[in-house]
Amino acid sequence: MSEDRKAIKRALISVYDKTGLEDLAQALHRAGVEIVSTGSTAAKIADLGIPVTPVEELTGFPECLEGRVKTLHPKVHAGILADTRKDDHLRQLDELGVTPFQLVVVNLYPFAETVASGADFDDCVEQIDIGGPSMVRAAAKNHPSVAVVTSPGQYEDVVSVLNTGGFSRAERTKLAAEAFRHTATYDVTVATWISEQLSAADTELEFPGWIGSTSTLARSLRYGENPHQSAALYVSHGASGLAQATQLHGKEMSYNNYTDSDAAWRAAWDHERPCVAIIKHANPCGIAVSDESIAAAHRQAHACDSVSAFGGVIASNREVSVEMAEQVAEIFTEVIIAPSYEEGAVEVLSQKKNIRILQAEAPVREGFETREISGGLLVQERDLIHAEGDNPANWTLAAGEAVSAEVLKDLEFAWTAVRSVKSNAILLAKDGATVGVGMGQVNRVDSARLAVDRAGEERATGSVAASDAFFPFADGFEVLAQAGITAVVQPGGSIRDDEVIEAANKAGVTMYLTGARHFSH
């Protein structure tokens, strides 16, 4: 037996999730391990006909306060925390009549699941585990002497070492690290929830006074934004979205694949109608909606800028049909992401060996988003199409005549789509599709010129335009008017609004003001 291995002679088991408990208890019993257990765990083991010592028999103190106090006792924690490498600790154990544990198996009350179920405050508080984390942390601290297991997924490892002298020191250290991560995640979940409750109760406190989050390494990526940068994907606990997407086909996702897919996924789901968004370098090559079919939406989105769409990322907010898949298969595409795929669509797409096919749940649309800055974190409410000014019914007609219902529908589409464009952003649209996108320029005039240039004379004529922020001068608007747009929607709010509105009236272009802005940096 290696000197750093600790044979398992005595185990303490207290688990809420009983998955795998039967096999574990039977294996421990066959190996001659003494089992001490609590409450329903002890009852489950006893029902298997396996000898088990209830913890109250060990402590001489009954379980009380509706189960809130079971294991918080020196005879339990001394047996966990005793460093058996130290003669003084062994002497004290002998004096106290305490036998040490070599294995602690604990999983915790389902606090996060209780919160997610919509339970009331008191029920959530009742699911905050106290004794469990105390035992886990004690065993993890004392990993030179004790192995700690916090997940049914680790039970096979326990069984495999029972006849080989127990876990090695390195293995116990690894288990301890996993245990500390487990309790840290649990504590962050509790602390975040209770901070949110305080914020909700205090109308003057818009943001919680404390923010915590935990993420787990999902996989290393080939490299980051550039080949000289290392990178990895971490998944957030309790979250769902792109990071948890199922990859149905293709090469491993890259860092840039993820950033573009995230932008595309969000852009597609900004729209309630069937929508396809094609993204490259986090900016739209094309976005389109269609009540005819998702394939029609894809054709229109691709037509906006077919050159830039080469090697792009495609997102659909509806099931991808075989018809759409056949269209996509004709174009080099890095990633396609959708909530589902019609039978046969994946097979069609898979003819392209390298395309990455993802299936994901709809993105989280509420809540807050964060951005790291040097020395801190910026937090803001996620920008959604839900401001009062995003509803055309609340727009102000500032110039020209009211447009028809069809043109207003195009204006609403353009206004929704421009949120996905990096500022300064100008977007031209016609018939539910973008026809020209001007993005990321440091002045609005250049964004307008870029949008018009991308559209070309034929498509720009008769289109409508959206600007993510106000026109500071009339010059940006005049570029659009000269290109032949019929209507434009913009936030307004410039000190030169009168000048811009006057230019619209002179050009015979209808102008709506939203009072809302959608910068994106």
Curated annotation (Swiss-Prot):
Keywords: Hydrolase, Multifunctional enzyme, Purine biosynthesis, Transferase. Pfam families: AICARFT_IMPCHas, MGS. GO terms for cellular component: cytosol. Signal peptide: none annotated. SUPFAM superfamilies: Cytidine deaminase-like, Methylglyoxal synthase-like. Pathway: Purine metabolism; IMP biosynthesis via de novo pathway; 5-formamido-1-(5-phospho-D-ribosyl)imidazole-4-carboxamide from 5-amino-1-(5-phospho-D-ribosyl)imidazole-4-carboxamide (10-formyl THF route): step 1/1; Purine metabolism; IMP biosynthesis via de novo pathway; IMP from 5-formamido-1-(5-phospho-D-ribosyl)imidazole-4-carboxamide: step 1/1. GO terms for molecular function: IMP cyclohydrolase activity; phosphoribosylaminoimidazolecarboxamide formyltransferase activity. It catalyses: (6R)-10-formyltetrahydrofolate + 5-amino-1-(5-phospho-beta-D-ribosyl)imidazole-4-carboxamide = 5-formamido-1-(5-phospho-D-ribosyl)imidazole-4-carboxamide + (6S)-5,6,7,8-tetrahydrofolate; IMP + H2O = 5-formamido-1-(5-phospho-D-ribosyl)imidazole-4-carboxamide. InterPro entries: AICAR_Tfase_dup_dom_sf (IPR024051), Cytidine_deaminase-like (IPR016193), MGS-like_dom (IPR011607), MGS-like_dom_sf (IPR036914), PurH-like (IPR002695). This is Bifunctional purine biosynthesis protein PurH. It comes from Corynebacterium efficiens (strain DSM 44549 / YS-314 / AJ 12310 / JCM 11189 / NBRC 100395). The gene is purH.
